[in-house]
UniProtKB/Swiss-Prot annotation:
Assembly mode: Homotrimer. Interacts with the capsid vertex protein; this interaction binds the peripentonal hexons to the neighboring penton base. Interacts with the hexon-linking protein; this interaction tethers the hexons surrounding the penton to those situated in the central plate of the facet. Interacts with the hexon-interlacing protein; this interaction lashes the hexons together. Interacts with host dyneins DYNC1LI1 and DYNC1I2; this interaction might be involved in intracellular microtubule-dependent transport of incoming viral capsid.
PTM annotation (Phosphotyrosine): residues: 925
Protein name as annotated: Hexon protein
N-acetylalanine: residues bearing it: 2
Length: 937
C-alpha cells in the first residue's frame, strides 16, 4: 500500500488510470502541448493499466464478472421469481451498479406479428388481379342440371406441339427424335414464359400454363402463397388413387390437363392451349381481402374481382430498457435485498414512486437518447414528425410521367408491301406480306408518380391510424367483436379522401382527430422497430437478454462483505413486457413468453485487499452512509377524468410545504395505463407505448387552465405575471388582448413559466436554452406551434357544407370512399374551396400547438417571479412552519374516453443505506413533504 495517510485513499479508485503527464517524460509532454493545435496526440500514449494504478493483487481480483445462479426460483402464470445468495468475501466490495440479470427464454410473438409493410408474396401484382383460376357454373332446371367449368387466366409457356400427353417442350437428341413433354408435377413453370416481346412471324403457336382448380378457393394474386410439395417447386396437393391390385391405396399429385381450342373452331378441333390444373395449399400469410363482391367464398366469376390489401405492419419487441419486465412499485411483487444476519429488507416499495419513468429521464440527462444501445435494449420510442404534423406543400409534378409498351410503339396494324406501276400500284413480292407498323405518336400512359407516392404515404401513415370511429368494415367481410384484436384492427379500412393530398394543402397542420391518438403506436416508431429487429424477423424467438436493475436504492449500491439474500420478480404478462406498433391485445392474439434461466452477473471492485478493506472501513462508519436520490424524486398521483369531463378539482390535506419543488403534470389515457398496484391487471388489454412508464406523453395540448390555491391569504405566485395570480392559463381560443405567443394559442404567460421551470430562463427576449439543457424530454425541443386558414362558414355566403360522400376530387381516378379500384369519370372537383388566388374565399385562421414527450411544469420556490407577499423576515408565508392545504383545479379539453390526470409533486425522495456490520444492511427512506416511506431498521 502507498504511504499511509489520514485522508481516505480515494486515489485508489481511479478507473481511467493516471493522467498522461504523470508517467510520460517531460520532453514528450512538452511536445504534445506545443503541437496540440495542429496535431492532437490524444490518447496515443494512454497508460495501458486499467482501474487502480497500483496495489492490484491476483488475476482473480481482476476477473470481469461473476455469475450467480439462483438458489430458488418460482415460475408462476404471470411472474417468475428468482432468489440469489450474494456472498461478498472479506476485503471485497461488490458493485451493484455493475450487476445485471442475464435472462434466457422463449418468446412467441403471436400471429399478429408482422415486421414489414406490404406483402412478401407477389407484391408487384395489381391488388385486384386474380391467379389463373377455375370455377364451376351450374345451369338449367332441376331435371336437366348442367355444370360447366370456367377458366380465367393466362398460359405463358410456349411449346412445339400439344397432344394428349400434354405440352411438347422439346425433342430428345436421339435418332428417334422422341418428343419431350412437360413434367406435370412442376411444368409449365409459372415463372417461365416468352423471353422477348417479338412475335411477328404470324404462326399459330401452342401454349401451356397452370391453373387452380375450383376446389382451391380464389384469392387475389397479390399476397398469394402456396408451399412447394416437391424439390422442383411444384405446389400440387396429393390425391388418393382408387385401390387397384392388392387393394393398396396410393397417392398421386392432384393434377389434370385441360385442353382448349379457339372459340371460332367448329369441327376440326386442334388444341392451342393446355392448362395443367391443380389443387394447392393456397394461403395469404400477410394480406387480406378488402373488397369482396359477395358473401360466398366459393369460386365464381364475381370473386375474380376480389381485391387484396397487405396486413398492417405490427412490430413486436421488448420495451425500451425492458420497461415493464421487472416488478416495481407493486404490492407483494417488489424485490428483496437483505443481509442474512439481520433479515431487514432494504427495498421498500411505494405505490406512487416512478422507477421506470425516472430511469428514462435519468438516461436522457446523461446522454443522447437517440443513440441506440442494444445491450440494455435501449432504443427510445419515437415517431416520424412528418406523420404527426403534416407539412402538405403539394406535389412537384410539373412534368408528366409516362410509361410505354415494351416495344416502345404499342398496337400496330399489319401491312403488305406494294410498289408503283404506271398510274397505279401493285404488290411488291420483294417485301413481306406481314409488316407490323403503327402510325401517329407511340402509345403511352401517364401516371403522376409524385402524387401517388404522397397519397400513398398519407393513407398508410395517417389515415389507417385514425380513431376507429372514422373507419368501417368492408362489405361482406366479417370481423371479430373484440376491437382490441389484430384481426379487427387489420380488417378495418378508412376512406382515403379523409386524408388526401388536397386536405390542408399548403398548411403545416396536424389532423384534429389524430392529435389525441398515440403517435408512438406506429410502424414508423424507429426505436420499437429496432428493438423488434434485434430479436429477428420470425414469430418464435429463443431470446438471450441482459436487464439492468433500476430501483434507485439498489442500482448504485456498494455492497460490503457479508452474505445477502437478493430476489426479484419478473413479469410474464405479454402486454406489459412486450410492445407492439398497433397496441393490440397480445394476450388474446396468442403471444407468450417463458423464461428458462435468469442468472445474475456482478463485478467486484478490482482493488487490492488492503485497498478494499480501507474502503470498507470508511463505509462502515455511519457518517459515510450511502445516500441515493431517486432521479425524479416525486410522489405521483393519478386522478380519473371521466369521458367528456372538462374540470378536475384536487385537494391535498394540510401539510408543511418546506422543501417542496413544484408540480409536473400531463394526461394519460386510462386504456394505456396499467394498474401497477396489482401483479396482473386483467383489464389491461393493450400493448402499445405506456406513457406512465416510458415517457411517451402526447396529450399536453388538451390542458386549458390550472389554478393553484393555498388556504392562506397569500396571492401565489404574485401579481407581476400577465394574468391573474393563482391561475395559469395555458391556451386561449379567443385572444383579443394578444396574450398568445408563437403563432399559436399558447399564452405568453405559460410559455414563460415553462422556460423558467425547464431552463431557468425568465427573460422574454430572444434566448434559446443551451444544448445540454434542451434534452429529448424537455419543453423547447417538443413545442410545435401551427396555424392554418379554413373557409369562413359564417361570412362566405356561397358556402355549402358538402359532406364526405358527396365530395369529389380526382373522380374517375380513385376509388369511391374506399381503398379499392378507381371508378367514376373525369369531372371538375367540388372540394375544397380555394383559399388562394383571385377567387380565394373568405377564411378564418385556426391556431393550435402540440407538445409531446414533456410534462408541464410549475416551479415552486421563493425566487420564482416574487412568490407572493414576503413577510418582514423575508420569508414567504408558505414557508412558515404552519401547514397549508392545497386546492388545484384543472380545466381540460373534453375527450370521448376516460383519461387520467398524472400529477407529480416534486419532493425529495432519498434513501440512506447503512451497513454497520457484516451481513447487515439497513435503509431509511425519507420523502418531504409526502413522507410515505418507512425505515427498515
Amino acid at each position: 500500500m502507498a504511504t499511509p495517510s489520514m485522508m481516505p485513499q480515494w486515489a485508489y479508485m481511479h478507473i481511467a488510470g493516471q493522467d498522461a503527464s504523470e508517467y510520460l517524460s517531460p520532453g514528450l509532454v512538452q511536445l504534445a502541448r506545443a503541437t496540440d493545435t495542429y496535431f492532437s496526440m490524444g490518447n496515443k500514449f494512454r497508460n495501458p493499466t486499467v482501474a487502480p494504478t497500483h496495489d492490484v493483487t491476483t488475476d482473480r481480483r481482476q476477473r470481469l464478472m461473476l455469475r450467480f445462479v439462483p438458489v430458488d426460483r418460482e415460475d408462476h402464470t404471470y411472474s417468475y421469481k428468482v432468489r440469489y445468495t450474494l456472498a461478498v468475501g472479506d476485503n471485497r466490495v461488490l458493485d451493484m451498479a455493475s450487476t445485471f440479470f442475464d435472462i434466457r427464454g422463449v418468446l412467441d410473438r403471436g400471429p399478429s406479428f408482422k415486421p414489414y409493410s406490404g406483402t412478401a408474396y407477389n407484391s408487384l401484382a395489381p391488388k385486384g388481379a386474380p391467379n389463373t383460376s377455375q370455377w364451376i357454373v351450374t345451369a338449367g332446371e332441376e331435371r336437366a342440371v348442367t355444370t360447366t367449368t370456367n377458366t380465367f387466366g393466362i398460359a405463358s409457356m410456349k411449346g412445339d406441339n400439344i397432344t394428349k400427353e400434354g405440352l411438347e417442350i422439346g425433342k430428345d437428341i436421339t435418332a428417334d427424335n422422341k418428343p419431350i413433354y412437360a413434367d406435370k408435377t412442376y411444368q409449365p413453370e409459372p415463372q417461365v414464359g416468352e423471353e422477348s416481346w417479338t412475335d411477328t412471324d404470324g404462326t399459330n403457336e401452342k401454349f401451356g400454363g397452370r391453373a387452380l382448380k375450383p376446389a382451391t378457393k380464389m384469392k387475389p394474386c397479390y399476397g398469394s402463397f402456396a408451399r412447394p410439395t416437391n424439390i422442383k417447386g411444384g405446389q400440387a396437393k396429393n390425391r388418393k388413387v382408387k385401390p387397384t391390385e392388392g387393394d393398396v391405396e396410393t397417392e398421386e399429385p392432384d393434377i389434370d390437363m385441360e385442353f382448349f381450342d379457339g372459340r371460332e373452331a367448329r369441327d376440326a378441333f386442334s388444341p392451342e392451349i393446355v392448362l395443367y390444373t391443380e389443387n394447392v395449399n393456397l394461403e395469404t400469410p400477410d394480406s387480406h381481402v378488402v373488397y369482396k363482391p359477395g358473401t360466398s367464398d366459393d369460386n365464381s366469376h364475381a370473386n375474380l374481382g376480389q381485391q387484396a390489401m397487405p396486413n398492417r405492419p405490427n412490430y413486436i419487441g421488448f420495451r425500451d430498457n425492458f420497461v415493464g419486465l421487472m416488478y416495481y412499485n407493486s404490492t407483494g411483487n417488489m424485490g428483496v435485498l437483505a443481509g442474512q444476519a439481520s433479515q431487514l429488507n432494504a427495498v421498500v416499495d411505494l405505490q406512487d414512486r416512478n422507477t421506470e419513468l425516472s430511469y428514462q429521464l435519468l438516461l436522457d440527462s446523461l446522454g443522447d437518447r437517440t443513440r441506440y444501445f442494444s445491450m440494455w435494449n435501449q432504443a427510445v420510442d419515437s415517431y416520424d414528425p412528418d406523420v404527426r404534423i403534416i407539412e402538405n406543400h403539394g406535389i412537384e409534378d410539373e412534368l408528366p410521367n409516362y410509361c410505354f409498351p415494351l416495344d416502345g410503339i404499342g398496337p400496330a396494324k399489319t401491312y403488305q408491301g406494294i410498289k408503283s406501276k404506271d398510274n397505279g400500284w401493285e404488290k411488291d413480292d420483294n417485301v413481306s406480306k406481314s409488316n407490323e407498323i403503327a402510325i401517329g405518336n407511340n402509345q403511352a400512359m401517364e401516371i403522376n408518380i409524385q402524387a401517388n407516392l404522397w397519397r400513398s404515404f398519407l393513407y398508410s401513415n395517417v389515415a389507417l391510424y385514425l380513431p376507429d370511429v372514422y373507419k368501417y368494415t368492408p362489405t361482406n367481410i366479417t370481423l371479430p367483436a373484440n376491437t382490441n384484436t389484430y384481426e379487427y384492427m387489420n380488417g378495418r379500412v378508412v376512406s382515403p379522401s379523409l386524408v388526401d393530398s388536397y386536405i390542408n394543402i399548403g398548411a403545416r397542420w396536424s389532423l384534429d382527430p389524430m392529435d389525441n391518438v398515440n403517435p408512438f403506436n406506429h410502424h414508423r416508431n424507429a426505436g420499437l422497430r429496432y428493438r423488434s429487429m434485434l430479436l429477428g424477423n420470425g414469430r418464435y424467438v429463443p431470446f438471450h437478454i441482459q436487464v439492468p436493475q433500476k430501483f434507485f436504492a439498489v442500482k448504485n449500491l456498494l455492497l460490503l462483505p457479508g452474505s445477502y439474500t437478493y430476489e426479484w420478480n419478473f413479469r410474464k404478462d405479454v402486454n406489459m413486457v412486450l410492445q407492439s406498433s398497433l397496441g393490440n391485445d397480445l394476450r388474446t392474439d396468442g403471444a407468450s413468453i417463458s423464461f428458462t434461466s435468469i442468472n445474475l452477473y456482478a463485478t467486484f471492485f478490482p482493488m487490492a485487499h488492503n485497498t478494499a478493506s480501507t474502503l470498507e472501513a470508511m463505509l462502515r462508519n455511519d457518517t459515510n452512509d450511502q445516500s441515493f436520490n431517486d432521479y425524479l424524486s416525486a410522489a405521483n398521483m393519478l386522478y380519473p377524468i371521466p369521458a367528456n369531463a372538462t374540470n378536475i378539482p384536487i385537494s391535498i390535506p394540510s401539510r408543511n410545504w418546506a422543501a417542496f419543488r413544484g408540480w409536473s403534470f400531463t394526461r394519460l389515457k386510462t386504456k394505456e395505463t396499467p394498474s401497477l398496484g396489482s401483479g396482473f391487471d386483467p383489464y389491461f388489454v393493450y400493448s402499445g407505448s405506456i406513457p406512465y412508464l416510458d415517457g411517451t406523453f402526447y396529450l399536453n395540448h388538451t390542458f386549458k387552465k390550472v389554478s393553484i390555491m393555498f388556504d392562506s391569504s397569500v396571492s401565489w405566485p404574485g401579481n407581476d405575471r400577465l394574468l391573474s395570480p393563482n391561475e395559469f392559463e395555458i391556451k386561449r381560443t379567443v385572444d383579443g388582448e394578444g396574450y398568445n405567443v408563437a403563432q399559436c394559442n399558447m399564452t405568453k404567460d405559460w410559455f414563460l413559466v415553462q422556460m423558467l421551470a425547464n431552463y431557468n430562463i425568465g427573460y422574454q427576449g430572444f434566448y434559446i436554452p443551451e444544448g445540454y439543457k434542451d434534452r429529448m424530454y424537455s419543453f423547447f425541443r417538443n413545442f410545435q406551434p401551427m396555424s392554418r386558414q379554413v373557409v369562413d362558414e359564417v361570412n362566405y355566403t356561397d358556402y355549402k357544407a358538402v359532406t364526405l360522400p358527396y365530395q369529389h376530387n380526382n373522380s374517375g381516378f380513385v376509388g369511391y370512399l374506399a381503398p379499392t379500384m378507381r371508378q367514376g369519370e373525369p369531372y371538375p372537383a367540388n372540394y375544397p374551396y380555394p383559399l388562394i388566388g383571385t377567387t380565394a374565399v373568405k377564411s378564418v385562421t385556426q391556431k393550435k400547438f402540440l407538445c409531446d414527450r414533456t410534462m408541464w411544469r410549475i416551479p415552486f420556490s421563493s425566487n420564482f417571479m416574487s412568490m407572493g407577499a414576503l413577510t418582514d423576515l423575508g420569508q414567504n408565508m408558505l414557508y412558515a412552519n404552519s401547514a397549508h392545504a392545497l386546492d388545484m383545479t384543472f380545466e381540460v379539453d373534453p375527450m370521448d374516453e376516460p383519461t387520467l390526470l398524472y400529477l407529480l409533486f416534486e419532493v425529495f425522495d432519498v434513501v440512506r443505506v447503512h451497513q454497520p456490520h457484516r451481513g447487515v444492511i439497513e435503509a431509511v427512506y425519507l420523502r418531504t413533504p409526502f413522507s410515505a416511506g418507512n425505515a427498515t431498521t
